[in-house]
């Protein structure tokens, strides 16, 4: 088990309960979800990235206005966020201060539409290392009050300790 790093303490903590959900479960998000969460400003399909890069390389004057114009030519609207319909359920269950409260809340889910999702999330959490879950949750709470530089340093310091004494699986 490990914890989200590479600045995740900073950017996930700004997503409140949804950030806690992502940190604890390790669920991946799509570009649609990233747009919904305001983690990105634009969606450019991966098959258009090379053309965007070439357009930027070919532009002799990379002013802010020209860059915005070039990027605008490649922006598309992705599919609807899969995370958006789960947001209320995520807030309901992942807003607690302790992992055991989150897990208990998921067990107690009565909404028939949310129950399969809650059971899946509980199963994921129960497979995770206890120390990794507790650490990830604590980092999300601490990160809300720290700068990016402070979060990066905290993650670095914790990594050093983790590799020496943590619950880290090599492979």
Model segments located where?
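CoA-thioester-processing core
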Residues: 1-19, 35-37, 52-56
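Glycine-rich beta-to-alpha active-site loop
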Residues: 1-4, 21-31, 42
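Generic secretory/membrane-interface signal
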Residues: 10-15, 24, 62, 149
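C-terminal alpha-helix plus adjacent terminal tail
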Residues: 29-32, 47-171
């Amino acid at each position: 088990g490990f914890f989200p790093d590479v600045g995740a303490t900073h950017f996930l903590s700004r997503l409140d309960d949804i950030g806690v959900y992502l940190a604890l479960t390790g669920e991946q998000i799509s570009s649609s979800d990233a747009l919904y969460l305001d983690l990105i400003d634009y969606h450019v399909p991966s098959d258009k990235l090379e053309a965007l890069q070439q357009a930027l390389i070919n532009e002799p004057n990379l002013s802010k206005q020209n860059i915005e114009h070039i990027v605008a030519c490649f922006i598309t609207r992705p599919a609807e966020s899969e995370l958006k319909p789960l947001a209320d359920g995520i807030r309901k269950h992942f807003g607690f201060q302790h992992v055991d409260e989150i897990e208990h809340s998921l067990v107690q889910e009565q909404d028939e539409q949310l129950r399969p999702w809650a059971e899946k999330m509980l199963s994921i959490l129960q497979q995770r290392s206890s120390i990794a879950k507790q650490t990830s949750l604590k980092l999300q709470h601490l990160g809300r009050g720290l700068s990016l530089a402070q979060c990066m340093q905290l993650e670095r310091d914790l990594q050093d300790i983790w590799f020496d004494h943590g619950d880290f699986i090599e492979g």
